[in-house]
A protein has these predicted regions:
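Glycine-rich anion/phosphate-binding loops
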Residues: 15-31, 61-69, 91
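Single conserved hydrophobic/aromatic residue that forms the stacking wall/gate
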Residues: 1-7
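Active-site-adjacent beta->alpha loops and helix N-cap segments on the catalytic face
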Residues: 87-105, 148-165
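Short, well-ordered coil/turn segments that N-cap beta-strands
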Residues: 37-42, 78-82, 105-109, 138-140, ...
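Conserved, mostly hydrophobic/aromatic
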Residues: 32, 75, 83, 142
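Active-site-adjacent loop and "lid" segments of alpha/beta metabolic enzymes
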Residues: 40-71, 111-135, 156-189
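Short, thiol/selenol-centered motifs that function as redox-active sites or metal-ligating centers
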Residues: 7-10, 144-147
Length: 189
């Protein structure tokens, strides 16, 4: 699994790594390929940029597609076997990433969003809408990851299943952390 933020995310957080985006992506995929020893697929991982799209922010949708496209090109050239677009909170960013990948290659694309306990993303998208839109754009798998733990994934997955004609992914985390007697604990449920 190769996980590197987009050039925009790296530059805006001022880590001084924007000029190493291509190198880091290539190296991560090479290391992953070496570790897999031909026994596993290597996924190029993309996630949120941390930027707000217009009209909330200044970033235009077309420019965001180009950011993801630049990263996708490098990952394809480096030998990625598939793409995982994950932990997304914005359907618009998901759309931009899928469009960018589709413009670059025909590798499989798995897309997963993270949902709040109310069953919507941070930006208000429900699972049914996300499923219909992302599979119509060519996603090969639609799903949910992280969020607030396994129990809160049941209803969103059921809603996805009503419309999905592609496989559904559910990849929970340990839930939200809680502090008990000064110790962080995860009450998975």
């Amino acid at each position: 699994l190769s996980l590197v933020g987009s050039e925009m995310c790296i530059r805006d957080r001022e880590y001084g790594l924007a000029d190493r985006l291509e190198e880091m992506n290539r190296e991560l995929i090479a290391l992953s390929k070496k570790a897999a020893q031909g026994k596993a697929l290597v996924a190029a991982d993309m996630t949120m940029t941390g930027q707000q799209l217009y009209p909330i922010g200044d970033l235009m949708f077309e420019d965001l597609v180009e950011v993801y496209k630049e990263q996708a090109k490098v990952m394809v050239e480096a030998g990625a076997d598939l793409f995982v677009v994950e932990t997304m909170m914005s359907l618009q960013e998901c759309r931009a990433a899928v469009i960018a990948i589709k413009e670059v290659c025909d590798l499989p694309i798995m897309v997963s969003l993270t949902y709040n306990p109310d069953g919507r993303t941070l930006y208000g998208t429900d699972p049914s809408t996300a499923t219909v839109i992302l599979q119509s754009l060519g996603a090969d798998v639609i799903g949910i990851n992280c969020s607030t733990g396994p129990e809160d994934m049941i209803e969103p997955v059921k809603k996805m299943a009503e419309y999905a004609v592609i496989p559904i992914l559910a990849k929970p985390n340990a839930g939200l952390p809680e502090l008990e007697n000064g110790v962080t604990v995860y009450k998975t449920g």
